[in-house]
């Protein structure tokens, strides 16, 4: 028999809840939310779809298509949130400013937000957007877990070296509280570590693992 992460079943039964263009359109601010953030084309939607075993988040050949706060229901008390992608050059500046304003309002005022998953493309980590998110997480005391996405694009040795380099840089600049891992959506690499982070933030880790046949 094999131990099963308690968050896995909830992720597999997740459903689309609603999209919000601004904070007052979000669900009631109660329960547990974990938000997924990342620069455009960092693989955010693909990672979210892989974790939920579904096609919940819209993927596109054109980065920056996620323009709303998209909420996905795990159960009556728990939600995942797909945040707008940032940084794509073809997105008009007024739209970028609109996204930034409402993202800041969501991140700064959402009581139910328990943690932030930040996606970084392993080939281009620590962008200006990533640094801003790291600064915000530390300043606000928000738990953060980083997925170095597209790890399959590098050899394992190169991916591991990048992980160690970014991990060292984060520890020097932002302390030891932020965790980081390798992740690949197509190869399904790193799922268990990501599920463990989600389970802890959603207060499922102490409920005991379910036994899978």
Swiss-Prot record:
Residues annotated as binding GTP: 38-45, 64-68, 82-85, 149-152, 182-185
Keywords in alphabetical order: Cell cycle, Cell division, GTP-binding, Magnesium, Metal-binding, Nucleotide-binding, Septation
Necessary cofactors: Mg(2+)
InterPro entries registered for this protein in UniProt: G_ENGB_dom, GTP-bd, GTP-bd_ribosome_bio_YsxC, P-loop_NTPase
SUPFAM superfamilies registered for this protein in UniProt: P-loop containing nucleoside triphosphate hydrolases
Family matches, as Gene3D superfamilies: P-loop containing nucleotide triphosphate hydrolases
Molecular function GO labels: GTP binding; metal ion binding
Domain EngB-type G positions: 30-204
Keyword Metal-binding in annotation: yes
Family: Belongs to the TRAFAC class TrmE-Era-EngA-EngB-Septin-like GTPase superfamily. EngB GTPase family.
HAMAP family noted in UniProt: GTPase_EngB
Record's function text: Necessary for normal cell division and for the maintenance of normal septation.
Stated name of the protein: Probable GTP-binding protein EngB
